[in-house]
Amino acid sequence: MFNILYAFGWLFTLLPLRVLYFFSDLFYPIVYYIIRYRKSVVRTNLEKSFPDKTQKELRKIERRFYRFFCDLFLETLYEINISEAEIKRRFSFVNIEGLLEQHAGGKGILIMTAHYGNWEWGMNFPLFIAEDIVSCQIYKGLSNKQFDRFMYNLRAKYGGINVEKRELLRTMIKYKSGNDQGIYWMISDQTPAAQKIHYWTEFLHQDTPTLTGTEQLARKFDYAVFYAEIKRIKRGYYQCELIPITLKSAQTTEFEITEKYMRMLQKTIEDEPEYWLWSHRRWKYTRN
């Protein structure tokens, strides 16, 4: 079944993106009004995150989120056949020079991003740097083996190295011993497992458990840390600004990096909330 769906998807993505957006407009009312995909989760998340907004304002954000969600799904499929030239035309970086300056000075780099905008297109970062620079993205395997293979290959399409979470420390030690300490993309807005919650913060008006592994590694190896803020410029076009969180991680206090990241992400979401993945059960744990 997966092979059939993949073949259909592959043929589908031969169409121009503007045609795929026509289908996205058709899918939106089906997903929003009929399937109602995770609507209760989305609605609850929005209501708790923006307690000062009216129901009318919240529903407007909700509808915009689902429209973007349909676009995002087809943009991800479109990546199967997208060319290097088109990726570079549709996705751009700001301050990549500042990041590469730190890397050239011998620093390893950790990039903290989120499920915001088109983060999958951001994984094509290796296209924007020299081929000999080690660029890794942390990859969590999916339960469906065939879909897992599809996403694994898609993310590695343009030279990025997929690193399983359990192999991350070993990989970082390996590259630290060489001339290139590497650049690592981390999707850092996920919910940690209950037994691995070490830090809570107020995020979008709610007590929120946070991942702290990126900070721990940054402080251990004294890597520079950047926040990748992805903005949607217009339909099908994105800009990612690489904002320094710290260039001297070893000098930071415990949870300082995590807290700065969460504040930056909150500002991004508050500015344009419809582009965050509201269907994720981000607040499934409560603080005792």
Predicted features, each with a name:
Residues 1-113, 118, 153, 159:
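Membrane-anchoring hydrophobic helices of lipid-metabolizing enzymes
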Residues 15, 34, 49-51, 130, ...:
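A broad structural signal for alpha-helix termini and local helix breaks/kinks
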Residues 37, 93, 117, 145-146, ...:
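Residue-level recognition of alpha-helix initiation/capping sites
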Residues 60-63, 128, 153, 166-288:
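Non-catalytic C-terminal accessory region of glycerolipid acyltransferases
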